[in-house]
Curated annotation (Swiss-Prot):
One of its GO terms (cellular component) is cytoplasm. Belongs to the acetylglutamate kinase family. LysZ subfamily. Its EC number is 2.7.2.17, 2.7.2.19. One of its GO terms (molecular function) is ATP binding. It is found in: Cytoplasm. Its main location: cytoplasm. It catalyses: [amino-group carrier protein]-C-terminal-N-(1,4-dicarboxybutan-1-yl)-L-glutamine + ATP = [amino-group carrier protein]-C-terminal-N-(1-carboxy-5-phosphooxy-5-oxopentan-1-yl)-L-glutamine + ADP; [amino-group carrier protein]-C-terminal-gamma-(L-glutamyl)-L-glutamate + ATP = [amino-group carrier protein]-C-terminal-gamma-(5-phospho-L-glutamyl)-L-glutamate + ADP. Substrate binds at residues 60, 162. This is Putative [LysW]-aminoadipate/[LysW]-glutamate kinase. One of its GO terms (biological process) is arginine biosynthetic process via ornithine. It holds the Pfam family AA_kinase. It is an enzyme of class 2 (transferase). InterPro entries: AceGlu_kinase-like_sf, AcgluKinase_fam, Asp/Glu/Uridylate_kinase, LysZ.
Length: 245
């Protein structure tokens, strides 16, 4: 089993980074859609605010209006990705948390650092992933390759939620007992402009301090995946790949 996370920024250029000939019935694709969210928000005049968590990871503040844009944008990305795969003879099946694949609980508060102070945000529609519907995914795998949009569903509040695509990929990999987790991004991990081709797990912390933003988040998910049974994690960009094992 292999789980492939496709970053929203690379969906339009998948033919340059994804070897579709290697896809088989034991693969699951998860995708994000930040590029699509930003583009749709601009067209609709919806302000998207980006904040930084106390751990240093940037995130999008998800108001109810932003949530509506988020869901619509990710479903558009999902359609494009599924169409790309089907045009190449792959039986791709578009799904999301709204189909019951990814269940989450809405966060009661979100912490962010503003002007050097930690503040609490209580009107956010982001979630903590609670479970992956393994039975449903196994049924999808019988007929094709599931392509999961990173939208979760909160059954208690009956609302969709914004969840991080890298975290969705991690949870799917663990739930499905995947041997490999692959992140497709616009860039591999760089230090001083050079691609880091391999990160031994025993030296992980040394490399982590050079990472920032989305790459730091990917590396953190990579370590959790390896510690939870995944054998290999690959961060693959247009400029090369970083293997973590």
């Amino acid at each position: 089993m292999r789980v492939i996370k496709v970053g929203g920024s690379v969906v339009p250029m998948l033919d340059k980074i994804l070897d579709t000939s290697s896809l088989h019935g034991n693969s699951i694709i998860v995708h994000g859609g930040s590029r699509y969210v930003d583009e749709m928000a601009r067209k609709l005049g919806v302000k998207v605010e980006r904040l930084v968590s106390p751990s240093g990871v940037m995130f999008r503040r998800t108001t109810r209006r932003v949530l509506d844009v988020y869901v619509a944008a990710l479903m558009r990305a999902n359609r494009e990705l599924v169409s790309f795969l089907r045009e190449r003879g792959i039986d791709a099946i578009g799904v999301s948390g709204l189909d019951g694949v990814v269940l989450a609980k809405r966060k009661k508060l979100v912490k962010a650092v503003v002007n050097g102070k930690v503040i609490a945000i209580r009107d956010d529609y982001s979630g903590v992933i609670k479970s992956i519907n393994v039975t449903l995914l196994k049924n999808y795998l019988k007929v094709g390759i599931p392509v999961i949009a990173s939208i979760a569903y909160d059954p208690e509040e009956n609302v969709p939620l914004n969840v991080d695509g890298d975290k969705v990929a991690y949870h799917v990999a663990i739930a499905m007992k995947a041997k490999e987790l692959r992140f497709l991004s616009d860039t591999a991990f760089l230090i001083d402009g050079n691609v880091v081709e391999r990160i031994p797990l025993e030296d992980f912390d040394e490399y982590l301090r050079y990472a920032g933003g989305g790459m730091k988040k990917k590396l953190m998910m990579a370590r959790k995946a390896l510690e939870s049974g995944v054998k290999k994690v690959v961060i693959e960009g247009l400029n090369g790949r970083t293997v973590i094992s």
